[in-house]
């Protein structure tokens, strides 16, 4: 999405810095990508947020807009009344954005600190059937990583934790797929629901040599209106792919 070196602004950054945790969303004919821009450890705010947008998912995208709110794991939520918000970690913190999501127009405030209360991050909001559903990654990024969900009738809460939490977690230390968390719900054009989340495959002595990978499992909705992932069985090592048209993308890079 960021193709020009001057727009990327990666010069002189130390190892492990740069862009973290990108998230994509759609609003009024445009695709929005937001990510954390991790600077070196200087200044008052060294984890800023960027937003780029395009009318096509493959781009070209706009120049990055910088939002000077410290945190990680940004996501954008668009409410029914047209107001737009960004969420960040340290629980689920929220602040309002302007119409084109290039400026912060309110102070950040805490929605909910999570159900597990340990390292809550990766917040995403979904509005469905009159509820705001708040998804969070909790438990740290090791074996205790998990996805929890809470809900409220009002955007600013009070949020009620799901009685089935965590709705995604690997409980078997011997399984190959571990460290499951930071999930985002998506609905296909056929009406089916899925959870996109990160995980790590434990190879040999426990290292995930491919780092964090992307996983997909189905979401079902309980009679009392809660989303659960893969029938609460944890991550699936093999899953039937969604029945959707295939998309062919060509990599035009010379590298």
Describe each model-derived feature in a short phrase.
Residues 1-255:
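Carbohydrate-active catalytic/glycan-binding domains of CAZyme proteins
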